[in-house]
Regions:
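Membrane-interface amphipathic segments in extracytoplasmic regions
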Residues: 1-165
Length: 165
């Protein structure tokens, strides 16, 4: 499978034999993040042109999953976790423990590579910000978002997600 690869190269560009060879020879790691946190991060990074978070969310919902940006598209439609046997699923917020394990498995020195992820003040601030932004949404938008990300919420354990019922 010696084709020119770019960071955007998708498995669909390869034939079945090449796909099986790649999936069998790589350690497959999937990094996941709560869908609502992904929306907030995208909005804060200015990727949405909407003036308010509520109108940004409405733009996302109006775009649907087929026209959705990779920044907020449901993970299940991007990464196919039911079709690809991932070796590791690393959840945002648990990087220190999980990346340490991955580096150890790869035979790399863990302590010298990993930065400290200990700023609980940042986590608290992000939680507060999430609560504020979630409160901007209408009941209808909250229901639509839960439906939009239904398969992500079912496939991954986002137990503290604002979108979980």
């Amino acid at each position: 499978y010696h084709k020119q690869l770019t960071k955007e190269t998708q498995l669909s560009k390869f034939n079945q034999t090449e796909i099986e060879a790649m999936l069998g020879s790589y350690t497959k790691v999937l990094f996941i993040r709560d869908p609502f946190q992904r929306l907030i991060a995208t909005f804060l990074q200015g990727m949405g042109s909407s003036p308010s978070f509520s109108s940004f969310v409405q733009d996302v919902l109006d775009s649907g999953t087929h026209n959705a940006s990779v920044a907020w598209k449901p993970l299940v439609s991007l990464c196919r976790p039911c079709l690809i046997p991932y070796d590791y699923v690393v959840m945002f917020g648990f990087h220190r423990q999980e990346l340490g394990h991955l580096l150890q498995k790869a035979g790399l020195p863990v302590e010298s590579i990993l930065p400290e992820f200990t700023d609980t003040q940042v986590q608290w601030t992000y939680r507060w910000l999430s609560e504020q932004m979630f409160s901007e949404l209408s009941v209808q938008q909250k229901k639509q978002l839960s439906h939009f990300y239904h398969w992500d919420l079912a496939a991954f354990s986002f137990s503290s997600s604002f979108l979980s019922d």
